[in-house]
Amino acid sequence: MRTWMAATPLLAVAVIAAPLTAQGAAAPAGEPTLDEVRTLTMRYQSVDTALADGYIRDPGDVCETAEMMGRPADVGTMGIHFFRPDLLGISGPPNPRIDGTGTHTDFRKPAVLIYEPQADGSLQLVAVENLVFLKSWESAGHTAPPTFLGNAYNRMVDDPATKVDEAHHFAPHYDLHVWVHKENPAGVFAQFNPSGTCSHHKPKAHAH
């Protein structure tokens, strides 16, 4: 995720019989299945609906690729990120990095939506994402990364010894992508999608 992003804690829900995920494994109590996440976020195939619900397009209007992060080009792309500042706990500009108080992990209402530019100029919803800031997560008493359906979030911290910003201009954080709207050969929880493309991206003239 990249750009400006009060945290809504994930409420534990007592479940007697855990539902099945798309892969057929039982979802942990209180967590939605992949099918449920897909169904609940299908409405955001309309960018106008996403904007009306408080999602904001990345002010930098960047379509992110693996190559930008110092990875081989064939690793794939992410896309253009739209985010909810309230769910990420972001209340101001970078200083010097984008930082917030967010610890929101409920994929029923993801903090980030990811779109892939299409040849006709439209945007296709491909994935959803949650991002939590490391400092806030640990301050809440957590000693391990958040997880979703048994998959640990990725720990993102910049390494000043490299030219690439591994944390994408963000303060240290955890994030997890879930590709429920586009098949991903690398896996539903991979950061990048080898079948994705940013070739049709036309940055907005006003973006900076």
PLM region descriptions:
Residues 7-19:
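Bacterial N-terminal signal peptides
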Residues 23-208:
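Primary mode marks residue(s) on the alpha4-beta5-alpha5 output face of response regulator receiver
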Residues 1-4:
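Positively charged n-region of N-terminal signal peptides that target proteins for export
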